[in-house]
A protein has these predicted regions:
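Aromatic- and Gly/Pro-rich donor/ligand-binding loops
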Residues: 1-150, 154-161
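Basic phosphate/pyrophosphate-binding loop/patch that engages nucleotide-derived ligands
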Residues: 164
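A short, active-site helix/loop in glycosyltransferases that binds the activated sugar's phosphate group
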Residues: 167-182
Length: 182
């Protein structure tokens, strides 16, 4: 089994502990698994400190595109024009990474889907959806969503759409009930 881990926060010891626990549990449960952990290039040093030392685990930097691609991709997530990505070389390189994976796991920690409204976080989740990869959303905080601006409302809409795509979801049930999900 090939497992791709995305969106791993590296900002505190709790994130580190959750990451190491997830990796060790996956390796124990799936001894033949190969795990790749994709991270932002700017966070490489943090990942060196987090790394689980095992021959079945590989850490690598996210594909870096042209300087305008992050702005382009985040705008396209916002406007739901993700079909434009297929012409961008960075997107095509990301496609090969995601299609390698049998399952994509959004790593534990962070509140990127809610208060922080991290469009990069949504971008990586949308890639898994676009490439039809099974997606597990594990041990994350989710919401609350501010709704003051159009951008806030669009982020909430896309986030809730993604919530229905996840094959495995591990967040607090109380929070789901607050959104009157069915």
């Amino acid at each position: 089994m090939n497992i791709l881990i995305i969106n791993q926060p590296v900002f505190n010891r709790g994130d580190e502990s959750a990451h190491k626990g997830l990796i060790r549990t996956l390796l124990k449960r799936f001894p033949d698994a190969i795990i790749k952990v994709m991270h932002e290039a700017s966070l490489s040093e943090s990942y060196r400190q987090y790394a689980v030392k095992d021959k079945r685990v590989e850490y690598f930097s996210e594909v870096e595109g042209c300087i305008k691609f992050p702005r382009f991709r985040n705008y396209d997530v916002y406007t739901n024009h993700t079909w434009l990505w297929k012409w961008h070389p960075t997107y095509r390189r990301m496609e090969s990474i995601y299609k390698w994976a049998d399952v994509v796991v959004c790593a534990p920690g962070g509140i990127c889907m809610g208060g922080f409204q991290d469009w990069n976080h949504l971008y990586h989740l949308r890639l898994a959806q676009l490439f039809k990869r099974p997606l597990a959303y594990y041990g994350r905080s989710f919401g609350p969503f501010p709704t003051e601006t159009e951008r806030n409302r669009q982020f909430k809409k896309i986030s809730l759409d993604m919530l229905h795509y996840f094959g495995y979801l591990s967040i607090r049930d109380h929070k789901l009930n607050c959104w009157q999900m069915s």
